């Protein structure tokens, strides 16, 4: 198997089912998780780039749970596993909006997963980031709150 399309060690901790059920779904899936997107990347940009690998069934943009604004990830569902494999081969690790995008297999989108799981509504990884990243909303949420306690509002 090509290392660019292998199943990674990451597993969705909120998956409802056994580890072996999740593995089976991942190996047959045509859904990909895309991470490290800019908060400003649009659904149209996702379609434009990812459709180069095949026909897309749908794109589900990741949203802040409270603000309903993009928070740096999405799910891309292809019609065919082969197209998703091509995406893993050719698009994973490339740049979009000056960011290196991460692609990973997903067991299949379930309603509710489009929302960030962090305490503040976004992604958990953005809450603990200590650097400034303009493409992902500036400083991490915890640092931003220390700098200006009024920055975290729901």
From Swiss-Prot:
Record Gene3D superfamilies: 3.30.70.330
Keyword Nucleotide-binding: no
Annotated GO CC locations: nuclear cap binding complex; nucleus
Source organism, top-level taxon: Eukaryota
Molecular function terms from GO: RNA cap binding
UniProt cross-references to InterPro entries, sorted A to Z: NCBP2, NCBP2_RRM, Nucleotide-bd_a/b_plait_sf, RBD_domain_sf, RRM_dom
Residues in RRM domain copies: 30-108
Single Gene Ontology BP annotation: mRNA cis splicing, via spliceosome
Keyword Transmembrane: no
Subcellular localization: Nucleus
UniProt family annotation: Belongs to the RRM NCBP2 family.
Function noted in UniProt: Component of the cap-binding complex (CBC), which binds co-transcriptionally to the 5' cap of pre-mRNAs and is involved in various processes such as pre-mRNA splicing and RNA-mediated gene silencing (RNAi). The CBC complex is involved in miRNA-mediated RNA interference and is required for primary microRNAs (miRNAs) processing. Also involved in innate immunity via the short interfering RNAs (siRNAs) processing machinery by restricting the viral RNA production.
Assembly mode: Component of the nuclear cap-binding complex (CBC), a heterodimer composed of Cbp80 and Cbp20 that interacts with m7GpppG-capped RNA.
Descriptive protein name: Nuclear cap-binding protein subunit 2
Organism: Bombyx mori
